[in-house]
Curated annotation (Swiss-Prot):
Gene for this chain: cysS
Keywords tagged on the record: Aminoacyl-tRNA synthetase, ATP-binding, Cytoplasm, Ligase, Metal-binding, Nucleotide-binding, Protein biosynthesis, Zinc
Cofactor note: Binds 1 zinc ion per subunit.
Motif interval(s): 'HIGH' region: 32-42
Species, as recorded: Cereibacter sphaeroides (strain ATCC 17025 / ATH 2.4.3)
Assembly notes: Monomer.
Record GO biological process: cysteinyl-tRNA aminoacylation
E.C. number: 6.1.1.16
Protein name: Cysteine--tRNA ligase
UniProt binding sites for ATP: 282
C-alpha cells in the first residue's frame, strides 16, 4: 500500500500518515459561511483538500473514506445581509430572508465548486441542523468547569485547558498582549471566547438552558465533527487564516468536552492566496469571485483548478492572468490528446508518489507534462484524474477541443454529446480552406492570404502539408470572428 506523508501543523513535521481505522479514514474541512458568493481564496482549500480526498480514496478505497465539510448558516454577516434586504422593502420575515439567502448561497457554492471539479463530501452539515448537539456539548463543558454563564452568554474558560495555543505556537499571555481578542466586561479572562450568545426577538435564536440565543462560531465545527466523525478522527484541514483562533478554540472545547478522545490527529493548513502579488482587495480592483472568473471572464473551472494546484499548498499562491492563460493552453492540448481515450487501469507511479509526498501537486503536474510529451493519452487521463483534471465533464469549456483535416475527421474531449453545435464551425472552416486552396491554384495570393488571416484571427491553427492543409482550434477560438474575408 502507498505510504502517504503529510505535514502536520500540530507537530510541525512531515509524518507518515497512519489512519485510526483504515476501513474508515475520516477527514474534516472547515466550510464556508454562506452569506455571499465564494471568492477565489475560498476555492483554494476546497481544491487542495479535494486532491487529498481523492488520494485517500485511491489508497484506502472510495467506500473507506468519510469527508465532512460544513456550512455555517448562522452568523452575524448572514443576519446583516437579510436585514439589508428587509430594509430595501422585501416583505418576507427575517427568518424567511435568512433561509432564502443561505439556500441561495449554498446553491452558488455548489455550482462553483462543481465547476472546479471538487467531489462532493460525504456529509455537508448545516450548522442550524445541529443546534441540539451544540447545546449538549456546551452543557458538558459547563458541567466539567470549562465554561461559565454571564449575562446570557456562555464562555469557554481558556485557562482551564493547559495546552491552549499549542497548535499556533502562541502562549495565552502573548495573545493577550497582542490584543487579538475581544474584551468584554462579563469575561473572567480576556482570552475567554463565546460558546453561546443571546438573541433578541429580531435575530435567529433557539431556546437553551441560558435563554434564547444562538451558538458561537467555534462550537459549530466541534459539535458537528463529533457527531459525524467521533471524539477522535484522522485529519482536520482548512486555510491558514483559521489556525488561530478558530482551530485553536476547536481543539480546546473538543478535548475538554470529550477527554476520552484526541480530536484530530493530523492538522493541515493551506497558505493564503494573492492576486498579482497582493492580497485580494476590492479597493485594489483585484478581488474576484469564482463566479466572476467563470462567467464574466470566461475562464473554465478546470483552468482555475490547474492554476490553484500549480503551487504547493503550504506556500502562498499568486494568481495571475498569465498563469491562467498558460493553464488553459496546456489543458487544451491535453484534452485533445485524451479525446475519446479510455484511461489506463492505474495512474502513473511518479504522479502518485508526488501526491503521496505531502500533496506535491507541482511535481505531479510536471510529471503529467512528461506523460503528455510521450503522447500516452490513456496514462495521462488516469494520472490527471488523481488531481481532478481531464475528467469527462468539460466544466466550463465553451467549445470542446476539436481537430480536423480535409477529410472532415474530428476529435472531441469529453462526452460525444459535447460536439453538438460545432459541426457548423467545421463546415465553415473547411469551406474557407477549400476557397483558399482554389485561390492559390489560381495564383490569387491576395485572396488566399486574406482567408488565412481570417482563420488565424478567429483562433484556427493552420498547418500546410504536402497532403493539404490541416487545421486545429486553438484555445482562443472565437466562432464570432469567422466572417467573410475582405
Amino acid at each position: 500500500m502507498t505510504t502517504i506523508r503529510l505535514t502536520n501543523t500540530k507537530t510541525r513535521r512531515k509524518e507518515a500518515f497512519t489512519p485510526i481505522d483504515p476501513a474508515n479514514v475520516r477527514l474534516y474541512v472547515c466550510g464556508p459561511t454562506v452569506y455571499d458568493r465564494a471568492h477565489l481564496g475560498n476555492g483554494r482549500p476546497v481544491v487542495v483538500f479535494d486532491v487529498l480526498f481523492r488520494l485517500l480514496r485511491h489508497v484506502y478505497g472510495p467506500d473507506h473514506v468519510t469527508y465532512v465539510r460544513n456550512f455555517t448558516d448562522v452568523d452575524d454577516k448572514i443576519n446583516a445581509a437579510a436585514q439589508a434586504r428587509k430594509a430595501a422593502g422585501d416583505p418576507r420575515s427575517l427568518e424567511e430572508l435568512i433561509r432564502a439567502r443561505t439556500d441561495e448561497t449554498i446553491r452558488w457554492y455548489h455550482e462553483d465548486m462543481d465547476a472546479l471539479g471538487a467531489l462532493r463530501p460525504t456529509h455537508e452539515p448545516r450548522a442550524t441542523e445541529w443546534i441540539g448537539a451544540m447545546i449538549a456539548m456546551i452543557e458538558d463543558l459547563v458541567a466539567r468547569g470549562h465554561a461559565y454563564e454571564r449575562e446570557g452568554h456562555v464562555l469557554f474558560r481558556v485557562r482551564s485547558y493547559r495546552d491552549y495555543g499549542a497548535l499556533s505556537g502562541r502562549s495565552v499571555d502573548d495573545m493577550i498582549a497582542g490584543a487579538r481578542v475581544e474584551v468584554a466586561p462579563f469575561k473572567e479572562d480576556p482570552m475567554d471566547f463565546v460558546l453561546w450568545k443571546p438573541s433578541d426577538d429580531e435575530l435567529p435564536g433557539w431556546e437553551s438552558p441560558w435563554g434564547r440565543g444562538r451558538p458561537g462560531w467555534h462550537i459549530e465545527c466541534s459539535a458537528m465533527s463529533y457527531e459525524l466523525l467521533g471524539a477522535s478522527f484522522d485529519i482536520h484541514a482548512g486555510g491558514i487564516d483559521l489556525q488561530f483562533p478558530h482551530h485553536e478554540n476547536e481543539i480546546a472545547q473538543s478535548c475538554c468536552a470529550h477527554p476520552e478522545g484526541g480530536f484530530a490527529n493530523v492538522w493541515m493548513h493551506n497558505e493564503m492566496l494573492l492576486v498579482n502579488g497582493k492580497k485580494m482587495s476590492k479597493s485594489l480592483g483585484n478581488f474576484f469571485t469564482i463566479h466572476d472568473l467563470r462567467k464574466d471572464r470566461g475562464i473554465p473551472g478546470e483552468v482555475i483548478r490547474m492554476v490553484l494546484l500549480g503551487t504547493h499548498y503550504s506556500k502562498p499562491m499568486d494568481w495571475t492572468a498569465e498563469k491562467a492563460a498558460q493553464a488553459k493552453a496546456t489543458l487544451w492540448k491535453w484534452r485533445k490528446l485524451t479525446a475519446d481515450v479510455e484511461p489506463a487501469a492505474s495512474p502513473d507511479a511518479a504522479v502518485l508518489a508526488a501526491l503521496a509526498d505531502d500533496l506535491n501537486t507541482p511535481a505531479a503536474i510536471t510529471r503529467l507534462h512528461s506523460i503528455a510529451a510521450q503522447e500516452d493519452g490513456a496514462l495521462l487521463k488516469a494520472s490527471a484524474s488523481l488531481l481532478g483534471l481531464l475528467e469527462d465533464d468539460l466544466r466550463g469549456w465553451t467549445l470542446p477541443p476539436v481537430t480536423g483535416t480535409g477529410s472532415g475527421v474530428m476529435e472531441v474531449s469529453g462526452s460525444a454529446t459535447a460536439i453538438v453545435g460545432s459541426v457548423q464551425y467545421r463546415e465553415t472552416i473547411e469551406r474557407l480552406l477549400d476557397e483558399r486552396k482554389q485561390a492559390r491554384m489560381g495564383k490569387d495570393f491576395k485572396r488566399s492570404d486574406a482567408i488565412r488571416d481570417l482563420l488565424v484571427g478567429a483562433g484556427v491553427i493552420i498547418k500546410d502539408t504536402p497532403a493539404g492543409a490541416e487545421w486545429d482550434l486553438g484555445a482562443d477560438f472565437d466562432p464570432a470572428r469567422l466572417g467573410e474575408p475582405e
